[in-house]
């Protein structure tokens, strides 16, 4: 089968790899769609890989084309599925509480083992969810980031019956999906989205968000002054020092601030903002990954239900590419991230069968 292999930093090429033997609890999934995540950009071009060679890709959907002998009646050949990419140990304290995202010894498709930038992938059947009727494979690939957003919004403690104000810092794919999820789950919530890219904010306005463009120091400072202590909840999704500290400044007394993105540098919080956290009694909480299977609030079930009932994350797909185009595309995404070149894109979808 063909795979896009990261052989070293900044080097991804398509190679033929032998099919792996199917284990008893696995299903062979022929991959139909895989999203490129910002973590793939860092892993592929920012030196963030755990090992080489690596097949990346963890936002994926496909069709089951073979069953391991112990899969039983859970799935059938021909089922369209999406993949929860985290493989928990099922033995640690977190796993015993079904908090699989906090597993201390987890494995992961696309980072700690080979993932979906390939024609096929053998996936443990526990990690598969059947796509509801009418959900496309493109939307199926984006269930994973949608579930991550659902989890982050849940951490924000938005009150359903209250007219509350939420600020989302960062209008990437996650931020734009977050606007739509909030609109579905919390119609009384006023959503404000902040970013430095106008083309992303124009999209957000279609979904009913109030937007602020902060592409200069002056516009950023004006935003901080205008909205000081203005929001009941803040979700940080940009991963910059400026947005992390801004969340403290724009939060109301008693507000909850959700930190949801990885940092590429150390975060130093000025003493005045530490004092603000204390005086306003702000809650700062982290969010990572999503809740999956076995709990009353399964983010994946919520995400699938939203998509089955009209949410269309695939509408944010900027382009669809094949395996051979992954290297050049991730290079462009990385250069945009480090502000070397401009590349206006929200979500790129890989279709390995192209």
Residue ranges and their predicted role:
Residues 59, 79-80, 94, 120, ...:
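Residue-level marker of beta-strand positions
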Residues 198, 245, 298-354:
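C-terminal hydrophobic helical "lid"/dimerization subdomain
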Residues 135-217:
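Mid-domain Rossmann-like dinucleotide-binding core that forms the NAD(H)/NADP(H) cofactor-binding site
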Residues 89-169:
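NAD(P)H dinucleotide-binding glycine-rich loop of Rossmann-like/cofactor-binding domains
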Residues 231-235, 256:
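Short SAM/SAH-binding signature in class I
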Residues 20-34, 47-93, 132-134:
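Glycine-rich beta-strand-centered segment in the early N-terminal region that forms part
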Residues 242-309, 351-354:
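Glycine-rich phosphate-binding loop and adjacent beta-alpha segment
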Residues 218-228:
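Short amphipathic alpha-helix with an adjacent loop that forms part of the alpha/beta core around
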């Amino acid at each position: 089968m063909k795979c896009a292999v990261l052989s070293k930093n900044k080097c991804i090429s398509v190679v033929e790899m032998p099919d792996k033997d199917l284990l008893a609890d696995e299903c062979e999934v022929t991959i139909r769609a895989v999203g490129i995540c910002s973590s793939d950009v860092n892993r592929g071009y920012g030196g963030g890989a755990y090992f080489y060679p690596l097949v990346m890709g963890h936002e994926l959907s496909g069709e089951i084309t073979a069953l391991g002998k112990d899969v039983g009646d859970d799935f059938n050949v021909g089922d369209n599925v999406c993949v929860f990419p985290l493989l928990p140990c099922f033995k640690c304290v977190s796993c015993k509480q079904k908090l699989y995202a906090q597993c201390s010894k987890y494995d992961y498709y696309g980072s700690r083992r080979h993932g979906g930038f390939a024609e096929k992938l053998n996936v443990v059947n526990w990690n598969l969810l059947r796509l509801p009727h009418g959900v496309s494979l493109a939307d199926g690939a984006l269930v994973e980031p949608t579930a991550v957003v659902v989890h982050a919004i849940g951490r924000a403690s938005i009150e359903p019956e209250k007219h509350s104000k939420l600020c989302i810092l960062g209008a990437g794919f996650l931020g734009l999906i977050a606007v739509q999820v909030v609109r579905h789950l919390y119609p009384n919530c006023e959503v404000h989205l902040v970013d430095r890219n106008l083309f992303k904010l124009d999209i957000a306005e279609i979904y009913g968000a109030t937007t602020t463009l902060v592409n200069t120091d002056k516009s950023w400072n004006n935003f901080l002054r205008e909205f000081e202590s203005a929001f009941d909840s803040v979700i940080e999704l940009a991963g910059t020092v400026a947005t992390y500290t801004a969340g403290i400044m724009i939060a109301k007394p008693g507000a909850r601030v959700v930190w949801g993105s990885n940092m590429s540098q150390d975060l130093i919080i000025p003493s005045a903002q530490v004092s603000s956290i204390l005086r306003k009694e702000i809650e700062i909480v982290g969010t990572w990954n999503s809740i999956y299977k076995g709990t009353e609030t399964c983010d994946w079930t919520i995400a699938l239900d939203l998509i089955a009932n009209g949410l269309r994350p695939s509408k944010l797909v900027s382009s669809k590419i094949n395996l051979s185009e992954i290297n050049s595309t991730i290079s462009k995404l990385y250069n945009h991230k480090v502000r070397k070149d401009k590349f206006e894109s929200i979500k790129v979808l890989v279709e390995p069968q192209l």
